[in-house]
């Protein structure tokens, strides 16, 4: 099918605290769009403040799909996201609207737009083996091993990203092939015309300031109390993907007495900066991206121009 005759979907991706949500809501209100969230933290219920989830007032103005769809005790994979996103895209198109996919979870965007290769299922024995090695040698040693077998993934996965680092090693030990080799397989192209936007400030200092200000606002809004409520649940712990979300882990460890309040604030802001850096690294290698500068008053007009 010619791309001009295909239905259009819009993606708006960017690092945390770059202004994606406000811009997406403005576009949704002017362009008959409906928003699909592309965020691995916003999927969880009862994780509102630390995930910067849109408020009820904002959601009433511009509803978001794929928010509050999982309990924090549950898992949710990139494959789950791809399936859910496609189902919601089809529902939005059937209603005569344009799907607007907004977020900063680049793995979800990649899964949707490029498809997923059949990776091996988790192997608990190998995971336990990796955990023992980490306990003995540390994460940097595991990252050094990854660099030997898969330098491309090693460049992309930070030593302080335990979930993705251990998974990359696990995949290799199960299959004998690197994550990069296995993900070369491309799925059939989506039957949509995809118009892609990235948003970020030109000056990284501006982003760092926004990250710090937003985290302090979260604390004023009751973020510590939110984590206390989650921590009180017997079924939640720090090994769950939900509790590994940036900010939640650091506040949890503060509540465990691992460090004082000021250290928690500093660690949370640094971890959020590291997340933003990884997001920007993904985006710099993204093809066919129309760049917008955070806070530019012409952004909405540029979006509307591309979307007509």
UniProtKB/Swiss-Prot annotation:
Q: Which GO terms describe its biological process?
A: tRNA modification
Detail which positions bind substrate: 16-21
Q: Where is this site: Interaction with substrate tRNA?
A: 105, 127
What residues bind ATP, as annotated? Answer: 14-21
- Asked if the record carries the keyword GTP-binding, the reply is no
Q: In the UniProt record, does the keyword Magnesium occur?
A: yes
The entry lists its GO molecular-function terms as: ATP binding; tRNA dimethylallyltransferase activity
Q: What class of enzyme is it?
A: transferase
The coenzyme or cofactor needed here is: Mg(2+)
Q: Keyword annotations for this protein?
A: ATP-binding, Magnesium, Nucleotide-binding, Transferase, tRNA processing
Which residue stretches belong to region Interaction with substrate tRNA?
39-42, 163-167, 244-249
Q: What Enzyme Commission number does this protein have?
A: 2.5.1.75
Query: What reactions does this protein catalyze?
Result: adenosine(37) in tRNA + dimethylallyl diphosphate = N(6)-dimethylallyladenosine(37) in tRNA + diphosphate
Protein role: Catalyzes the transfer of a dimethylallyl group onto the adenine at position 37 in tRNAs that read codons beginning with uridine, leading to the formation of N6-(dimethylallyl)adenosine (i(6)A).
Please describe the quaternary structure of this protein. Answer: Monomer.
Family per record: Belongs to the IPP transferase family.
HAMAP family (UniProt xref): IPP_trans (MF_00185)
Looking up PANTHER family in the UniProt record yields: TRNA DIMETHYLALLYLTRANSFERASE
Can you say what this protein is called? Answer: tRNA dimethylallyltransferase
Which species is the source of this protein?
Shewanella loihica (strain ATCC BAA-1088 / PV-4)
């Amino acid at each position: 099918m010619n791309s001009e005759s295909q239905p259009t979907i819009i993606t708006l991706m960017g690092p945390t605290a770059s202004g994606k949500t406000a811009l997406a809501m403005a576009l949704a209100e002017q362009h008959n769009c409906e928003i699909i969230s592309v965020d691995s933290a916003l999927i969880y219920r009862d994780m509102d403040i630390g995930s910067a989830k849109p408020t009820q007032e904002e959601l009433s103005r511009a509803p978001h799909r794929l928010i509050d769809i999982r309990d924090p005790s549950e898992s949710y994979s990139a494959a789950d996201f791809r399936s859910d996103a496609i189902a919601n895209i089809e529902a939005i198109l059937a209603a005569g609207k344009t799907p607007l996919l907004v977020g900063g979870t680049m793995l979800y965007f990649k899964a949707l737009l490029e498809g997923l290769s059949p990776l091996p299922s988790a192997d608990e024995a190998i995971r336990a083996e990796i955990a023992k090695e980490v306990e003995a040698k540390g994460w940097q040693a595991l990252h050094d091993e990854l660099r030997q077998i898969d330098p491309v993934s090693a460049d992309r996965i930070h030593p302080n990203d335990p979930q993705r680092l251990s998974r990359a090693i696990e995949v290799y030990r199960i299959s004998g092939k690197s994550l990069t080799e296995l993900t070369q397989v491309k799925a059939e192209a989506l039957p949509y015309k995809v118009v892609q936007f990235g948003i970020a400030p030109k000056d990284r200092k501006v982003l760092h300031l926004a990250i710090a200000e937003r985290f302090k606002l979260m604390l004023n809004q009751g973020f510590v109390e939110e984590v206390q409520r989650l921590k009180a649940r017997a079924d939640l712990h720090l090994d769950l993907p939900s509790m590994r979300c940036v900010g939640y882990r650091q506040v949890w460890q503060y509540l465990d007495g691992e460090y004082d309040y000021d250290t928690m604030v500093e660690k949370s802001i640094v971890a959020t900066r590291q997340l933003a850096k990884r997001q920007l690294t993904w985006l710099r290698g993204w093809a066919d991206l129309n760049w917008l500068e955070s806070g530019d008053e012409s952004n909405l007009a540029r979006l509307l121009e591309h979307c007509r």
